[in-house]
Amino acid sequence: MSSNECFKCGRSGHWARECPTGGGRGRGMRSRGRGFQFVSSSLPDICYRCGESGHLAKDCDLQEDACYNCGRGGHIAKDCKEPKREREQCCYNCGKPGHLARDCDHADEQKCYSCGEFGHIQKDCTKVKCYRCGETGHVAINCSKTSEVNCYRCGESGHLARECTIEATA
């Protein structure tokens, strides 16, 4: 993802805080190496060109992008001279305003990012998963499986940089 793309929807022309997809949750198209890709069918399609819901930019009649703050063309929201329009924060789970995901009444629709099951979120998950071996029931620090570790300081295997006896060069 480039630095001029929105972290919520992955589109350029605005920042995440001005994203027309709404409050805290984006579409999560890019996982940035963390293994998470969220796409919700419960959220309406919002055009990043005009900021209206019900269609995507590829189907928009506008020829140029509109500012998400004032709705006029010729500039983007971060450069808008109008006062910033406040957007109500929405639940990450259902997309509705007025509550946070942890307080959402739609708990049966919540999907855990760790185990993939519905009915709870990651912080409440009882099935911890080790990122080293991929097994459930323990975390990496308690993993009995040995893995080849490499030192970032000297490049040798078998130890970490904090255990390296080679002097660091600046």
Swiss-Prot record:
The keyword Amino-acid biosynthesis does not apply. The lineage of its organism: Eukaryota, Metazoa, Chordata, Craniata, Vertebrata. Associates with the 40S ribosomal subunit, the 80S ribosome and with polysomes. The keyword RNA-binding does not apply. Single-stranded DNA-binding protein that preferentially binds to the sterol regulatory element (SRE) sequence 5'-GTGCGGTG-3', and thereby mediates transcriptional repression. Has a role as transactivator of the Myc promoter. Binds single-stranded RNA in a sequence-specific manner. Binds G-rich elements in target mRNA coding sequences. Prevents G-quadruplex structure formation in vitro, suggesting a role in supporting translation by resolving stable structures on mRNAs. Arginine methylation by PRMT1 in the Arg/Gly-rich region impedes RNA binding. Its main location: nucleus. The modification Omega-N-methylarginine is found at R25, R27, R72. GO terms for molecular function: DNA binding; mRNA binding; single-stranded RNA binding; translation regulator activity; zinc ion binding. One of its GO terms (cellular component) is cytoplasm. PANTHER family: DNA-BINDING PROTEIN (PTHR47103:SF8). It is found in: Nucleus; Cytoplasm; Endoplasmic reticulum. It holds the Pfam family zf-CCHC. It comes from Bos taurus (Bovine). The gene is CNBP. The modification N-acetylserine is found at S2. Residues 25-33 are annotated as: RNA-binding Arg/Gly-rich region (RGG-box). Disulfide bonds: none annotated. The modification Phosphoserine is found at S42. This is CCHC-type zinc finger nucleic acid binding protein. The modification N6-acetyllysine is found at K8. SMART domains: ZnF_C2HC.
